Curated annotation (Swiss-Prot):
PANTHER family the UniProt entry points to: PHOSPHOHEPTOSE ISOMERASE, SEDOHEPTULOSE 7-PHOSPHATE ISOMERASE / DNAA INITIATOR-ASSOCIATING FACTOR FOR REPLICATION INITIATION
Sites where the protein binds Zn(2+): 61, 65, 172, 180
Positions annotated to bind substrate: 52-54, 65, 93-94, 119-121, 124, 172
Gene from which the chain derives: gmhA
Name this protein carries in UniProt: Phosphoheptose isomerase
Organism of this sequence: Sodalis glossinidius (strain morsitans)
Length: 194
């Protein structure tokens, strides 16, 4: 009954992935981000990640697989998703939702840490504020965006952009693939240079 729709959805996902894969800049940005994070861990720094909605789930997934595990057993890596419900509700209530991530970065971020901001539009005001707070703390910044990068375009040390202009779920599908590859590369880099 729905088999044609299922095939169509999978083919659209495949096409989005093939379009992303066809541009070497995307491959390089994933490698650059992985090296930046691995170098941060080697220097004693940590990763803070943030996003809204599905991107919030991706930020938590990223931190969880860094602190827990991906494919192989290895030591946990220092990563925190800005996702504590009491922090989010307190700051949203007292200061406004636009400050939920920046307040956390101001409190916990240190020079040499990395902020990973995830936004399919590249226009999330609370992530833009977090980027500003990270810069003020001397942190490096990686963003995962979509479309033309939005207001975040050019704001990061590394941007992994999915140039898809349809529904956001296609961008999120590439984001989670990029996140899994990042973790794989980080693990290889950490083992290779111990």
């Amino acid at each position: 009954m729905y088999q044609d729709l299922i095939r169509n959805e999978l083919n659209k996902a495949l096409q989005t992935l093939q379009n992303f894969l066809s541009d070497e800049r995307h491959i390089q940005s994933i490698e650059d981000a992985a090296k930046l994070i691995a170098d941060t861990f080697k220097a004693g720094g940590k990763v803070l990640s943030c996003g809204n909605g599905g991107s919030h789930c991706d930020a938590m997934h990223f931190a969880e697989e860094l602190t827990g595990r991906y494919r192989e057993n290895r030591p946990g890596y220092p990563a925190i998703a800005i996702s504590d419900p009491s922090h989010l509700s307190c700051v949203s209530n007292d200061f406004g939702y636009e400050q939920v991530f920046s307040r956390y970065v101001e409190a916990v971020g240190n020079k040499g840490d990395v902020l990973v901001g995830i936004s399919t539009s590249g226009n999330s005001a609370n992530i833009i504020r977090a980027i500003d707070a990270a810069r003020a703390k001397g942190m490096r910044v990686i963003v995962l965006t979509g479309k033309e990068g939005g207001k975040m375009a050019g704001s990061a040390d590394v941007e992994i952009r999915v140039p898809h202009f349809g529904y956001a779920d296609r961008i999120q599908e590439i984001h989670i693939k990029a996140i899994h590859i990042l973790i794989l590369l980080i693990e290889k880099e950490m083992v290779a240079q111990g």
